[in-house]
Regions:
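Hydrophobic alpha-helix feature that most strongly marks membrane-spanning transmembrane helices
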Residues: 190, 213, 244-247
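C-terminal helical subdomain
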Residues: 174, 198, 222-263, 269-275, ...
Length: 291
């Protein structure tokens, strides 16, 4: 497993959800290894404070901040445009941002917010940045899923959960979908020098519900996670491992727990479902149905 002595000098890494929790710990770890870290956050004031903190703690000035609302497809497209205006390479993309919403809400695009942020945002951002990721090969795409995917199931006729909404059902579905997306992406990227893997970070004691509903809902979610959760630093270890370790050079289409490849839920290996979900995701974000 890489240590903080592992050099990421010259590598450009983009981390979503980088202003708190696992994302913040991941961004700090990569900065300490010498990477150029591009943080993605939603709030400028908070983002700039975390940016300064990471620069100070890491001694690395190459820490950038881009702002985006990952529940908005327009904002995601602007994020990709902003990145491509500043950078010509992207060696590591970590789709870390995620949320739980205790009640059903729709985004500005009319989509259920958990599915939109936890799956469609990574799907859209990855595809928008894919050309520069390929041009930077060997490069890595890392999707932060959850063991909760094992309790999830997907009804392709009701991905937006319009029939009956339960927040754990919505979360499990979104994280299951993220594993399916990862495996389909890995297959489509074979031979390009780009790998795609996903992971369970552990149940992390952090402000996970920050993008959920109101303060009471956030408090409930945070209480659940903080009562038995690990630290964000511990939770970031597998993301950092997949981003930096020579041990996983060329390894793709895998699900990792504690930096070890594990079997994901049986349904995630259904290639027909992987393709079907890809095509529906492409339709929902208005992308051509190809890499």
């Amino acid at each position: 497993m890489p240590t903080m002595n592992t050099s990421m000098q010259g590598k450009i890494c983009l981390v979503t959800g980088a202003t708190s929790g696992i994302g913040k710990a991941t961004a700090l770890g990569l900065a300490q290894m010498g990477a150029t870290v591009v943080m993605v956050g939603r709030d400028r004031e908070k983002g700039e404070a975390v940016q300064r903190e990471i620069k100070t703690k890491s001694g690395n000035e190459a820490v950038d901040l881009l702002l985006a609302d990952l529940s908005s497809q327009e904002s995601i497209r602007q994020l990709a445009e902003d990145f491509l205006q500043r950078y010509t390479k992207l060696h590591v993309l970590i789709n870390n941002a995620g949320l739980i919403s205790l009640r059903r809400r729709e985004t500005v695009d009319g989509l259920e917010v958990t599915f939109a942020v936890n799956l469609l945002a990574p799907f859209l951002l990855t595809n928008l940045l894919l050309d520069v990721i390929k041009a930077s090969a060997p490069s890595r795409i890392i999707n932060v899923s959850s063991a909760s995917h094992e309790a999830g199931y997907i009804n392709m006729d009701d991905l937006q959960l319009e029939g009956h909404y339960r927040y754990l059902r919505a979360y499990g579905q979104s994280k299951l979908a993220l594993v399916l997306f990862t495996y389909e992406l890995a297959r489509r990227l074979q031979g390009t020098g780009v790998t795609a893997n996903c992971l369970h970070p552990g149940f992390v004691a952090s402000n996970f519900g920050q993008n959920g509903t109101g303060p009471i809902s956030r408090a409930v979610v945070n209480l659940i996670f903080s009562s038995f959760g690990i630290s964000p630093e511990e939770g970031a270890k597998t993301s950092i491992f997949l981003a930096t370790s020579p041990e996983v050079e060329g390894v793709t289409g895998k699900y990792f727990v504690k930096s070890i490849p594990k079997r994901s839920a049986p349904i995630t290996y259904d290639e027909s479902l992987q393709r079907q979900l890809w095509e529906e995701s492409a339709r929902l974000v208005k992308l051509p149905m190809k890499v």
